[in-house]
């Protein structure tokens, strides 16, 4: 319903100003913002794998730029952002709690081996919430459990990417979405994967810049103009 309200407002504005209405999807905007942040105009029109990881998605997408998008992997239950936020709330922080979980995790210096559930490009994250609860019950510190949670997310994505790259060797992998702003996730993956691109939070948290790029491209104003 929130997206339909936006369509109605855009339609009314375009009619009142005699302007063309360019319809795009929410996910196209996020992918466009991610590709732009990762490599400017270079990845547009090329094949790549894109992770969109947030409180509402843990999707692995096979893209040919933002115009051709195929979902080739996802979670069978809980999304990564949900697992992180639920841990943060469990530790007493306000929702959304991802930033607090990241701060706690950064303070943990212990070596941790994550345990994950991945089959091919499909993951299950419901067990992660139970694992975090068990660790807290065993007396592990909030810092330890937060780091464990984020490393589980990172290892899950790494394994999904590895499975996808077996079928699509050599493709770059772009990681976008709020959860990907975690330095722990970024460091873990980049040390274990080549051609991994991470999107800065300012481009990942809102897809407005991606929508703007797509509209500019539609009217041939980008990448011909500086941005």
For every predicted segment, state its role.
Residues 30-33, 199-227:
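Glycine-rich phosphate-binding/hydrolytic loop that grips phosphoryl groups
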Residues 24-49, 213-214:
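Conserved phosphate-binding catalytic cores of ATP/NTP-utilizing and phosphoryl-transfer enzymes
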Residues 23-24, 173, 190-211:
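Conserved phosphate-binding/catalytic loops in two-lobed NTP-binding clefts
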Residues 1-11, 15:
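Short beta-strand-loop/turn "lid" adjacent to the catalytic site in phosphate-handling enzymes
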Residues 56, 177-179, 201:
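Active-site metal-binding loops of divalent metal-dependent hydrolases
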Residues 102-173, 179-197, 216-226:
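A contiguous, well-structured pocket-lining segment that forms one wall/lid of small-molecule binding clefts
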Residues 2, 48-52, 174:
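Short glycine-aspartate micro-motif
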């Amino acid at each position: 319903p929130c997206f339909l309200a936006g369509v109605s407002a855009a339609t009314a504005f375009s009619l009142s100003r005699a302007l063309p209405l360019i319809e795009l999807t929410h996910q196209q905007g996020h992918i466009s913002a991610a590709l732009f942040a990762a490599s400017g105009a270079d990845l547009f029109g090329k094949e790549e794998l894109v992770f969109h990881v947030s409180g509402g998605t843990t999707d692995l997408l096979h893209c040919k730029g933002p115009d051709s998008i195929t979902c080739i992997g996802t979670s069978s239950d809980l999304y990564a952002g949900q697992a992180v936020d639920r841990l943060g709330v469990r530790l007493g922080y306000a929702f959304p709690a991802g930033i607090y979980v990241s701060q706690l995790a950064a303070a943990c210096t212990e070596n941790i081996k994550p345990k994950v559930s991945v089959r091919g490009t499909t993951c299950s994250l419901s067990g992660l919430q139970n694992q975090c609860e068990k660790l807290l019950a065993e007396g592990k510190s909030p810092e330890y459990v937060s780091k464990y949670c984020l490393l589980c997310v990172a290892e899950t994505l790494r394994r999904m990417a590895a499975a996808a790259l077996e079928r699509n060797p050599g493709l770059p992998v772009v990681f976008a979405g709020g959860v990907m702003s975690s330095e722990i996730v970024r460091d873990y993956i980049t040390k274990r994967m080549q051609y991994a691109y991470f999107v800065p939070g300012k481009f990942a948290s809102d897809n407005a810049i991606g929508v703007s790029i797509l509209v500019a491209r539609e009217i041939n104003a980008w990448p011909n103009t500086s941005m």
